[in-house]
Amino acid sequence: MKILVVSENFYPDTFAINDIVRILGERGHEVTVLTGLPDYTTSYIPEEYKHGKNREQVYHGAKVYRVPTIARRHGPIWRSLNYLSFVFSGNRAAKKIDFGEFDIIYVWEVSPVTMALPAIALKKKYKKPLFLYCMDIWPECVKAMGFKEGTFFYSKIKNLSAHIYQQCDHIAVSSKPFFDYLEKVDGCSRKKMSYLPQFASSDMLEKNFEKKPNGHFDFLYIGNIGKVQDIPCLVAAMAKLKDRKDVTFHIVGGGSEYEHAMAMVKEAGAENIVKFYGPKPFKEAMTYYKIADACMLTLDGKNRIGDTLPGKLQTYMAAGEPVIGAINGAGNEVIKESRCGLSVRAGDSDGLANAFLEYIAHQEKYANCGEAARKYFRENFTQEKHFETLEARLKEMINQ
C-alpha cells in the first residue's frame, strides 16, 4: 500500500509514530509523512530546522515533508499557537504540495485533534479514504487544560471535534472506553470504529531486565510527564516514603510538567529518594529497566481521559516489570486482569503509597507479576498483531 501519514509530531522527537512509519516501510509499504517541526522535547525548534532548513527529509525510506510551525515554548497561549500553526501550514501544504500517488491517509491522533484538519483537506483533494488512530479523545482533553464544560470555548471545540471525527472514514481507538465517548459526545457511528490497542516492541520480550534482590527497592517511571499523567498524585505518594533509606524512585522522561514535578519533589522534601534523569532516547531509556523492582503508572481520573490505556503500560509489560498504578478505566482493568501488579483508583496518593509499601513488605507475593505481564502482552499487545490488524483494516477501506 501507499500510505500518506499526517502527524504533527514526528522524529527526531520520540513518539510511537516514528516506529509505525519505520515498520510499515519494513513490511513493504510506501510511506510519505506530512508533519511539523520537532519541538516537543525541548519546547523550542532546533537550529537545524529553522529558517526553512530540512523541510524535506527521508526517514527509513519514507519521504518526510515538514511544514513551518510556531514553537510550543511554555504556557497555553504558545501551545495554542503551535497547534494552529500546524493546521494553517498543513492546509497550505495540502493545496500546494504534490504528494503523488497514494492509497489512503493515516492520521496518528494524539492531542490536538485539530492535527487531522490537513488530512481532511487532503482527503477532499485526492478523494482518498481517511483512517484516524485515536489515542486522545476530544473535546474531553480540553478539560485537562482547565476549560469547563458549558463554556463558550468548550462548546466551539466540541463542535469542531465532532466535525473532525465525523469526516473520518474509519476511527481505530486505542482504548475500549473511547467507543462510547465518540458515539455519545462526537456523534460517531459505532460501525465505523474498531479497537486497535497500542503496541510495544516484541524485542523486549526476549531481554532480561530482571533486577537481583539487594535489599534496596527501586521504582521506575518512564514516559511523558504532563498534566494528564497526574504527577501531583505520584509525587505525593513518593513523598510519603521519604524517610525510608531502602527506597529510590527513578523518573525518566520529560514534558510540560517536568520542571513542576521537580519543584514539587523539592517542596515535599523528597529529593533524597527521587531521582530525575530527563528525557532519553528509547534505547537508552530501556536500560533503566535493569535497575527496577517495579514500574509506576499514574493517570488523571478527573475526566474521561483517565479511561485511556496508556502506551507505557504495554511497554512496562513487555519488559516483564510488575506495575504499581493509580489509574481508572482500561489501565486499571488490564493490571487486574493480567495480574501484573497493584492498582488503586486514580488520584489516590495514599493508596498508591500503601501499594508501594505492600510490594516492599511482600515482594515474594508479586514474584510472578513480571511473567504474567509478558504473557498478557503476548496475547494482546504484540507488534505483529497490531500491524496485521491495521493492514487488514486499511486494505478493506481501500477496496471499498
Where are these regions (language model features)?
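Carbohydrate-associated surface elements
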Residues: 37, 177, 196-199
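A short, well-ordered alpha-helix in the C-terminal region of glycosyltransferases
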Residues: 351-354, 358, 365-379
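Membrane-proximal helix-turn-helix segments that form the acceptor-binding/catalytic region
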Residues: 114, 121-126, 152-171
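Acidic donor-binding loop of glycosyltransferase active sites
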Residues: 169, 273, 289-306, 321
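Acidic anion/phosphate-binding donor-loop and adjacent secondary structure
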Residues: 183-187, 191-195, 199-215, 230
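Nucleotide-activated donor-binding/catalytic signature segment of Leloir-type glycosyltransferases, i.e.
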Residues: 250-252, 259-286
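Conserved donor-binding/catalytic core segment of Leloir-type glycosyltransferases
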Residues: 212-229, 235-238, 250
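N-terminal subdomain of nucleotide-sugar transferases
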Residues: 1-60
